[in-house]
Amino acid sequence: MAKNGLVLCILVVSLLLDQTDGYPSRMKARKHSKRRVKAKDDDLKSQVEKLWREVNALKEMQALQTVCLRGTKVHKKCYLASEGLKHYHEANEDCISKGGTLVVPRNSDEINALRDYGKRSLPGVNDFWLGINDMVTEGKFLDVHGFAVSFLNWDRAQPSGGKRENCVLFSQSAQGKWSDEACRSSKRYICEFIIP
C-alpha cells in the first residue's frame, strides 16, 4: 500500500509540475491576447470617431445647401436675408446660430451681388447691417472675426459718427455705399455662409 501511495504521490506531483510549467506561457498568451483586443478596440474607436466627423460634415453641407436654396449663392458664399429687425449684436448672434456671420463684402463684385440680392429679398428696405465695426479702435474697421477690413466702400462724408456710430450699414439707396451707424439701431441684415 505504501508503494501505491508513493506512486500516487509521484503521479500527483508530476501532474502539478506539468500544470505549473505551462503557467507562464499561458499568462504570456493571455497578455498578448489582451493587447490584440485593446489594439482592435482602439482601432474601432478611431473608425467610429472618423465616421462621426464625416456625418457632421455631411450635416453641415446639407444645412449650407438648404441655406443656399432659401438665399442666393455668390462665388463661394451663400447669402440669406433676415426676417426681422435687430440691433448689430443680435443680428450677428442670429447669423452665428444659423452657422454663418453678418455679411462682409470683400470686393466690388460682392457689393453688386449684395445690392441685387438685397433688392430682391428685402424690398423697400433702404439699408442693412454689414459684419464690420470699429468698436475696438475708433477708425480701425474690423470684420466680425476681428480681422482688419482691406476693402472699404464708404459713401461721401462717411464714416461720420465718431465714437457714437461704430457699426457699418450697406445702403441700397446709395448703390451699395456704406455708412456708420449706432450699433443699438434696429436694422435688417443679411447673413453669409462660407462654402468649403
Swiss-Prot record:
SMART domains from the UniProt entry: CLECT
UniProt keyword annotations, A-Z: Disulfide bond, Lectin, Secreted, Signal
Disulphides: C68-C78, C95-C191, C167-C183
Subcellular location: Secreted
A single Gene Ontology CC term: extracellular region
Alphabetized Gene3D superfamilies for the sequence: Mannose-Binding Protein A, subunit A
Listed CDD domains: CLECT_tetranectin_like
Coiled coil region boundaries: none
GO molecular function, one term: carbohydrate binding
Pfam families per UniProt: Lectin_C (PF00059)
SUPFAM superfamilies: C-type lectin-like
Signal peptide as annotated in the record: 1-22
Residue ranges annotated for the C-type lectin domain, each copy included: 74-192
Function: Promotes cell adhesion to laminin and fibronectin.
PANTHER family, per database record: C-TYPE LECTIN DOMAIN FAMILY 3 MEMBER A (PTHR22799:SF2), TETRANECTIN-RELATED (PTHR22799)
Record-given protein name: C-type lectin domain family 3 member A
Name of encoding gene: Clec3a
